[in-house]
Design a protein with these regions (language model features):
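Gly/Pro-rich loop segments of beta-rich domains
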Residues: 1-5, 39-79, 107-139, 166
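Residue-level detector of Asp-centered blade-edge/turn motifs that repeat once per structural unit
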Residues: 9-16, 83-86, 143-147
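Blade-level signature of beta-propeller repeat domains, shared across WD40, Kelch, NHL, RCC1
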Residues: 137-166
Length: 166
């Protein structure tokens, strides 16, 4: 069994070896410290233990939409991830037709997933501010360094959308 996967390194000082992996078909985002991979386990390293450490976000195969603490949040086919310079992770949540955000500088127990852009599950095409814009299966997201401009690859609408965040 496989999954579409998308990866990005953390931009946070002191976390240069932390890699985030979005697993679309498993509806999760994992966190892996690549400095812990040794030559002996390079072919089998799965990250930290499954008991809440390797899995950074989302319930195992628990697809859906739910904002909130990392342990409770749900995704539906999260795809591309990217970061602002201050550690906010933007996620193209394709199946929910919205963009999600995690502040990765927060301790894992207090960090939360939010949906600042799009209307979860309300696919379509609508311009407007982040709270009214509609997308249809966005697969890509890019953000400028301070998080004020977000570009979204609105896949099923076949357009690149640009949003200004204030």
């Amino acid at each position: 069994a496989g999954s579409d996967s998308y990866i990005a390194f953390s931009p946070i000082k002191g976390e240069e070896n932390v890699l985030y992996v979005s697993l679309a078909d498993f509806h999760q985002i994992w966190r892996v410290d690549v400095s812990k991979i040794t030559p002996e386990d390079k072919d089998t390293y799965n990250g930290e233990s499954y008991a809440g450490k390797a899995i950074y976000e989302g319930v195992m195969n628990g697809k859906g939409w739910e904002d909130g603490l990392l342990k409770n949040a749900k995704f539906r086919h999260p795809r591309q991830i990217c970061f602002t310079d201050d550690g906010k992770m933007y996620i193209a949540d394709s199946g929910n037709s919205c963009i999600r955000v995690i502040d990765t500088t927060m301790p894992k127990e207090r960090a939360a997933v939010t949906t600042p852009i799009g209307l979860p599950g309300a696919e379509g095409y609508k311009d407007g501010g982040p709270e009214i814009a509609k997308f249809h299966f966005p697969c890509g997201v890019a953000v400028n360094s301070d998080g004020t401009i977000v570009y979204v690859a609105d896949t099923q609408n076949k357009v690149i959308r640009k949003l200004s965040i204030e």
